[in-house]
Amino acid sequence: MNYYLGLDVGGTAIKMGLFKETDELIDKLNFPTRTVEYLVDDIYQNIINLFNKNSINIDDLKGIGIGFPGHVDGETGIVVYSNNLVAHNFDIVGKLKEKINTYIRISNDANVAALGEFHFGKGKDFQNIVFVTLGTGVGGGIIVDGKMLEGKNGAGAEIGHMVISTNGHLCSCGRRGCFETYASATALIRNARVAMINNPTSLLWEIAESPEKLGGFTFFEALERKDKVATIIFEQYIEDLADGLTNLANIFRPDALILGGGISYRGDVLMEPLQQRLEKMIYGGQWNARVELMISELKNDAGIYGAYAMCSKRKK
C-alpha cells in the first residue's frame, strides 16, 4: 500500500493528514508552527511520529503535498515571500528532501484548499469553481477546467487584494479598499466594535461587555437577538461580500462559488441574503446560467485534502 501526506501550514499550527492511495484519510495531527529555522525539523519529526504511530514503513511514503501561506513558487519549491511566517526565498522542498527522499509539491495554502474542495468536497461535480475563505483575511483559490490557477511563479489568485472601494480601508498590503478589509471576519468585528462604541444602548454591550471582548460568537448572538446595531453592520457586510463575489463571478463565471472559514458556517443567515444579492448583481442576471453559492464541505480539512490531491499526481 502506498501512502501520502497532506500538510496545511498555518501561522500558528500545522495540520498533517495521512492518506492511503485509495483516498482514505487514516490519521491526522496538529502541531505548533515555530519559526522557519525549526520548520523542516518539526515537519520531519512529526512525519516520523505519525508513521510510527500507525506502524507504517516510511519507505511506503510516495508523496508529500504542502499548502503554505504567501507567494509560493510551485515549480522550484521555494517560498518566495510569506509575511505570516517571515519566510523569504525559503527552499522548504529542497530542505525536506534532504531528510525524506520522496515526491514533494508545494503551493499557496488557499489554492491548495480550493483543490481539496474540488476533488473531495462540494466542487467534485464541477469543472470550474472559485473557493473563498473568510477568516483573518480573505483568501481563495480558482479551478478552471479542472486545473488550479496559480499564475506566474505561483503568485496569482490573491483575491483578497482586489479593490472594491477606492480610497477605502487601509490594507496590510499597503493599498486601500482591498476585498479583505471589508469581507474578512476581522473586518466584520472591527466594524462592529466601532458601532458598539457609538451606540451605548446596543445589546452588544450586554453580551460582550466591552469592544475588546467582542468576537464572532458574541456578535452573532446579538444578531440572533435582532440587535439593531448588529443587524445594520451585518447587512453592510453582506453588501461588501457580495460586491467582491460578484466581481469573481463576472470574471471567471464558475459553476460554483464555495465559501469556507468560520463565518460561512453560519448557514442561512449568511447564504440566503448573499444569494439573493448575487443573483441581482451578476452580469446578465436571469439570462445567464446560475452560479451556485455553497458552503465548504471539508471545512478545516480542505487544506490537507488538497495537499494530498496535489502530491498524489491527480489532474490539477
Please name every model-derived segment.
Residues M1-K62, D73-T76, G94-T102, H119-F126, ...:
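ATP-binding/phosphotransfer module of carbohydrate and carboxylate kinases, centering on a glycine-rich
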Residues G77-H88:
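A charged helix-plus-loop insertion that forms the helical arch/lid used to bind
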Residues I104-N108:
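General beta-strand structural signal in soluble alpha/beta enzymes
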Residues A155-E158:
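Structural signature of FAD isoalloxazine-binding scaffolds in flavoprotein oxidoreductases
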Residues D8, G65-P69, F131-G137, G141-I143:
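Short beta-strand segments
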Residues K28-F31, N83, K152:
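Short hydrophobic alpha-helix segments
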Residues A114-H119, G140-I142, H161-M162:
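Adenylate-forming
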